[in-house]
Amino acid sequence: MKVFILTEGGKNIGFGHITRCRGLYDALKEIGIIPVFLVNGDETCKHLLRDTNYLVIDWLKEKEFCFELIKGATGVIIDSYLADEPFYLRVSKCCKTPIYFDDTKRLSYPRGIVVNGAPYAHMLRYPKRKDIKYFLGMRYVSLREEFWEVPQKTINMTIKNILITFGGMDHYALLNRIVVTLKKNFNFTFIKAGTAETRVVVTKMKSLIHKADVCISGGGQTTFELARCCVPIIAICLADNQLFNLRGL
């Protein structure tokens, strides 16, 4: 069975798409299906792809190579903000079952399956079509294997330990202001942009989350992992595509 996952990520655009797709990769592997990751990214994303079958390639520039590679596949999953409608249409013609991760009803998708695991997904009013199946709402959130089972969390009413993570995006000025404000009264751990989820292995990230009394985070994929661990979140909208997610929460 040939299954491909097309996505993107890196220091300049963050790692949320790769993180989400890694969860699906882990789930498919669990049932004996080993997909191939095709990742439009840079060196900073490779640690997220550790122990997977992957190829780092700009599949938007190498379209013909990509289409030839996925031709006849059982399934192709796309998680992208960069691919346009013609690209999706071409993919839908190359495989039996195309699957599209979506966050904002970004495109008019061709035939296939649209997955939006955000809490606001039903409010987007996707068009009803016979050739598209929709999987909407938080029951379809894709989490990495390390977050499938988590220890029970005790919520501390007194905040002592704070975790700060903004994913792969570089928000140094904002981070610096937060650190200056907190450093006199709290213990805090922060994960710098470019190292988040790359040099910090997932198991350590999970441990840091569990130890935190509260987490200051961006409003992307990390919020779902924090919610899974039952950690109180102060979420900050760091990009336009996070706004719907935070409104839904």
Question: Which residues make up each language-model segment?
Answer:
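Glycosyltransferase donor-sugar binding loop
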Residues: 168-169, 190-196
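Conserved active-site histidine-acidic residue motif and adjacent donor-binding/catalytic loop
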Residues: 61, 194-208, 221
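Short hydrophobic signal-anchor/transmembrane segments that target glycosyltransferases
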Residues: 174-188
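Active-site and donor-binding regions of nucleotide-sugar-utilizing enzymes
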Residues: 5-27, 38-129, 134
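Acidic donor-binding loop of glycosyltransferase active sites
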Residues: 207-221, 231-232
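Catalytic binding pocket for nucleotide-activated donors in carbohydrate/polymer assembly enzymes
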Residues: 223-249
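Short internal beta-strands
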Residues: 34-41, 189-193
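A nucleotide-sugar donor-handling region in carbohydrate enzymes
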Residues: 110-171
